[in-house]
Amino acid sequence: MLDHVFITVSDIDRSIAFYEAALAPLDIVHAVDYDGKDGPPGHPDLKGFGANGRVFFWLRQGAVDGRAAHVGFVAVGIPEVDAAYAAAMAAGAKDIHPPGAQRHYDPRYYAAQVRDPDGYSLEFVYKDWQH
């Protein structure tokens, strides 16, 4: 099981605004800012997002290779997948595939996929057998 993921973004303020909008339908919020000076030498400043008291998705400013990561966010139902996709598109995402069944994985696998402003692949996913 994963505990957290860091991604590097080219414009931290733009990315915070994007993720605040895109993740809101999933009840994932910008939860904490971490000052790198509080960590070991060379630790980056971080902007953390999470839900239910757990921070698990972190942004850091830097040089980007946006196609190097794919992140899937859990939705609690089909309406949340649809809402997250719509929010991400309204916030400037680029479409990879609109919401729908991903039959190549499983007929019950419902998801949408977008690219964030840095080109990262984001998936909003609902798997009814995992809820």
Can you say where each PLM-predicted feature lies in the sequence?
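Conserved beta-strand in the GNAT
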Residues: 55-60, 113, 122-125
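A short linear hydrophobic-aromatic micro-motif
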Residues: 31, 57-58, 96-99
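Long, continuous compositionally biased terminal/linker segments
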Residues: 38-83, 90
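Conserved catalytic-core motifs of GNAT/GCN5-like acyltransferases
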Residues: 29-34, 100-103, 125-131
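Vicinal oxygen chelate
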Residues: 11-14, 72-117
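Short beta->alpha transition motifs characteristic of CBS
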Residues: 5, 106, 113, 124-131
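N-terminal beta-strand motif that seeds the catalytic metal site of vicinal oxygen chelate
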Residues: 1-16, 71, 128-131
